[in-house]
């Protein structure tokens, strides 16, 4: 049978992974619509990072072009369990189900197999949807203190843990800035990992030291952009809303995404050229 002609093993896992991803992101979108309204939320892509649709596209592009592979009995059993976790009215269940599903795909497929590639992206998704939140819950103080230390290096302000002391400023009602979990670089790092994994698997690039180094450089770039964003708030606290919530925040987010995409993309292009040569 031709590629993508029948519902095969890759299609099953692409469907399950996408279902879990949609269930995990839906509450975020619904909350943003309730907060901003449908029109404004839509313009803001419902507060969902573009790396998630990129990951979904990569998963389905990989599955669509895959040779037919029969679904195993254990695949159906795993699929049934995942499906139950996806539909139960517990928000965290859909996110948590990505962990065993991705682990199962990685464990039951060879490294060059389509199912392994989908599982690789699924594992990357768990970083943003599962492990990032757990890490912040368990190690919030040291993680946020690292962000604060980077900002201190850029601005020279006094720092106490995750608290930046900016002093009294004319027209500003606060003299301290607290870095919370939503402002942590960890969130951006997890999204860069998703972008890296999606592009690497979509273009079938071998995970070499050079490709990993490009991913680490992309992570460093997004950490720097996040630190610059917070540093701008320190320098111009009177423009907090613009920098932290408004167009300024969106523009800096775009800069971080473009930088990461450029770094990862150039690495993939070099790898493909070397493979052809």
Features from the language model and the residues they span:
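Hydrophobic N-terminal alpha-helices or hydrophobic patches in metabolic proteins across all domains
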Residues: 1-277
């Amino acid at each position: 049978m031709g590629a993508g002609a029948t519902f095969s093993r890759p299609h099953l896992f692409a469907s399950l992974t996408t279902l879990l991803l949609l269930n995990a992101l839906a509450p975020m979108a619904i909350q943003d619509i309730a907060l901003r309204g449908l029109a404004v939320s839509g313009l803001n892509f419902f507060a969902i990072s573009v790396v998630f649709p990129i990951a979904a596209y990569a998963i389905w592009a990989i599955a669509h072009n895959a040779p037919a592979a029969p679904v195993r009995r254990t695949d159906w059993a795993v699929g049934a369990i995942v499906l139950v976790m996806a539909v139960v009215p517990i928000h965290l269940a859909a996110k948590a189900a990505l962990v065993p599903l991705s682990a199962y795909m990685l464990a039951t497929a060879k490294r060059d197999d389509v199912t392994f590639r989908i599982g690789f992206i699924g594992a990357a998704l768990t970083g943003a949807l599962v492990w990032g939140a757990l890490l912040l819950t368990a190690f919030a103080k040291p993680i946020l203190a690292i962000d604060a230390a980077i900002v201190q290096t850029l601005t020279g302000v006094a720092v106490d843990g995750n608290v930046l002391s900016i002093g009294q400023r004319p027209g500003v009602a606060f003299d301290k800035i607290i870095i919370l979990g939503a402002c942590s670089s960890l969130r951006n790092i997890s999204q860069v990992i998703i972008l890296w994994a999606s592009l690497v698997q979509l273009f079938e690039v071998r995970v070499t030291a050079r490709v990993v180094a490009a991913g680490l450089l992309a992570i460093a770039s997004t950490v720097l952009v996040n630190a610059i964003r917070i540093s701008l708030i320190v320098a111009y606290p009177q423009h907090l809303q613009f920098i932290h919530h408004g167009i300024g925040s969106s523009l800096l987010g775009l800069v971080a995404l473009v930088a990461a995409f450029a770094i990862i993309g150039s690495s993939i292009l070099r790898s493909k050229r070397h493979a052809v040569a």
